[in-house]
């Protein structure tokens, strides 16, 4: 199975690159989207419990500061349904970016209800609620897998060793371009400081509006 092979490759890369990652990575590729001075960047795993705990804070920061939340796929090899959930996220992205964002938020909100066996069924119900469907083969050409792999490889170059890894990024020359959020209780203070250093504003006239995900009721776990 392709997914199993990919997970084995990921595990091997973790083992081989561990020493290099411990020495830090290249964060130069992490920048705010066009039109924004400041953004939040997160490398996350949809099956990671700590990522689910961080999700409300990230969404609150996005709403409070009106800055983009840029998500990167970083499915860990020890999680048995995460990779497929990220593939589904990319599939929903292909329908609309808002739908992909809603799927990720939905997964984190209902993470404890997911299993490897019921993932597809939940995704099909989510799709139906959004007036679309999940085809039998959602990634026949491998394009979504390639996007997930590209994000994972970016995370390795950056030096990601755990999920979530959160950065505040800025294009201001008066502040550090990338600041890692080590203590999430300090994240808002870090954002305040970086926005102040960026001149007190977070976006330019060309910035795209940030949309909030549609809230969905909690799901019930499929009967085993």
Which residues does each PLM region occupy?
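Residue-level detector of short, conserved catalytic/binding motifs and their immediate flanks
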Residues: 38, 67, 164
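Bacterial N-terminal signal peptides
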Residues: 8-18
